């Protein structure tokens, strides 16, 4: 989960997020290398006294500054495309949950477990208990099992929303009249927080998402659905 004054990414809780963290470090290394080369070239240009104004052709240099950017783009694009296809892959989910965005709360439907439906509202400051997070905790959490593929069907009843949980590497738009889907497999139990990531009106900042991930054996016992 996130911490105060956190600079880096949140701890990965799914294979997709682990891939995203690795790709982030990979792309950042390439960017640092490009910046270093550009600054080094500028430094040499400003400090050298060896100049030649009669050069009209530099075939080798033109080849290098055409080929090198193409190679760099390929090194960035290939891992990115791989992750993009992984995020769209549907791996025989164990069960399906439907999430419906409203102004400004979420509705969840456990269609595979007796059609359980409930709303999830942000807890007002007066109802927070010690240890709860302001603007992030909700009255009804989404309880999910770890190490089981889950398919989340996402839509909206009014305006554009976006169902986002950074620790799982999830961000899927909720669009009225359209049903989007995403799959994920959590690897660690715990409580993980997200928020609507699409500006959806005056209370856009007040529709958090809370996932409580528990072992599969406990999840299948049933009482976890007592909200």
Swiss-Prot record:
Needed cofactors: Cu cation
Mitochondrial intermembrane side of membrane: 1-14, 88-227
Membrane topology, as annotated: Multi-pass membrane protein
GO molecular function: copper ion binding; cytochrome-c oxidase activity
GO BP terms in the entry: ATP synthesis coupled electron transport
Mitochondrial matrix compartment segments: 46-59
UniProt-listed Pfam families: COX2 (PF00116), COX2_TM (PF02790)
Binding note for cofactor: Binds a dinuclear copper A center per subunit.
PROSITE patterns: COX2 (PS00078), COX2_CUA (PS50857), COX2_TM (PS50999)
Annotated residues for binding of Cu cation A2: 196, 198, 200, 204
The reaction(s) this protein catalyses: 4 Fe(II)-[cytochrome c] + O2 + 8 H(+)(in) = 4 Fe(III)-[cytochrome c] + 2 H2O + 4 H(+)(out)
EC number in record: 7.1.1.9
Cellular component terms per the entry's GO annotation: mitochondrial inner membrane; mitochondrion; respiratory chain complex IV
Record annotation: effect of changing residue 4 to A: In strain: Isolate San Diego zoo Ppy3, Isolate Anna and Isolate Dennis
UniProt binding sites for Mg(2+): 198
Superkingdom of source: Eukaryota
CDD domains, A to Z: CcO_II_C
UniProt subcellular location: Mitochondrion inner membrane
Binding site residues for Cu cation A1: 161, 196, 200, 207
Transmembrane segments: 15-45, 60-87
Membership in a protein family: Belongs to the cytochrome c oxidase subunit 2 family.
Subunit structure: Component of the cytochrome c oxidase (complex IV, CIV), a multisubunit enzyme composed of 14 subunits. The complex is composed of a catalytic core of 3 subunits MT-CO1, MT-CO2 and MT-CO3, encoded in the mitochondrial DNA, and 11 supernumerary subunits COX4I, COX5A, COX5B, COX6A, COX6B, COX6C, COX7A, COX7B, COX7C, COX8 and NDUFA4, which are encoded in the nuclear genome.
PANTHER family: CYTOCHROME C OXIDASE SUBUNIT 2, CYTOCHROME C OXIDASE, SUBUNIT II
Task of the protein: Component of the cytochrome c oxidase, the last enzyme in the mitochondrial electron transport chain which drives oxidative phosphorylation. The respiratory chain contains 3 multisubunit complexes succinate dehydrogenase (complex II, CII), ubiquinol-cytochrome c oxidoreductase (cytochrome b-c1 complex, complex III, CIII) and cytochrome c oxidase (complex IV, CIV), that cooperate to transfer electrons derived from NADH and succinate to molecular oxygen, creating an electrochemical gradient over the inner membrane that drives transmembrane transport and the ATP synthase.
Protein name (Swiss-Prot/TrEMBL): Cytochrome c oxidase subunit 2
